[in-house]
Amino acid sequence: MRVGPSYQSTTRRRESLRLCCRIVGTPVEAARPTKSDFSATAAFFDLDKTLIARSSTLAFGRPFYRHGLLSRTDMIRGALAQARYRLSGADHRQMEKLRASACAACRGWPADRVTEIVSRYLKDLILPYVYAEARALLSEHRSAGQDVIIVSTSGEEVVAPIGALLGAESVIATRMRIANGHYTGEMECYAYGEEKAVQVRRLAAERGYLLPGCYAYSDSITDLPLLEAVGNPRVVNPDRALRRIATARGWPVLSFSTAERNSAQPMGIEAP
């Protein structure tokens, strides 16, 4: 894959975060899995715009604001980011802006308070946005005896509870550094781009998954390394760049559209 300037400018930063992600376990037609496909394999799912019709991180903006963790300025920035995300997805440049913004915003947050807020609002903010097609696909993979793993750039404190809610076996997610019970504003692991593929290969080696038989699902060109790491890549509501690659390579293209609620309203704008 050709690496553009915006990607190159952040490569060193991501290299310094490499190999420090941890796997978080949770209680757990052509594109559809069958029992004959599986022998020590797993299905790896991106989260935002693949399993759910919104950004899992930006979804919690309003409760974080209500409970004093975000300022009004943070909310305005979040609303603009949400609008851009819905219109055009997230390329490397956009993801770097979101990374920097998230690090700055969470500096000094009490970790236990974040956990409490996420737990309190999780079902209301996430369940209505789960694609019905994604829920059925998760069930099919589990019924076929395959582990379901969520691989997301969103924070572990958000992704792990969502994984538990959706019945995922484990999650791979970005992890923020916590010292003395508070977020420092620094990342210990940035689960993005090539790093997703690194962590998937690491998990496969630990658990004995046979990657040529594994599945991966994503909507974004930034997850091309993840999709290329397995033998059965599938793209879901893909952005234009990923759709072009999927078409050229003959990868199945899935269309998920059925969620319980329209997610058009940006973070902080919906009615109370």
Predicted regions and their residues:
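C-terminal cap/substrate-recognition subdomain and adjoining C-terminal extension
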Residues: 13-16, 20-34, 38-40, 116, ...
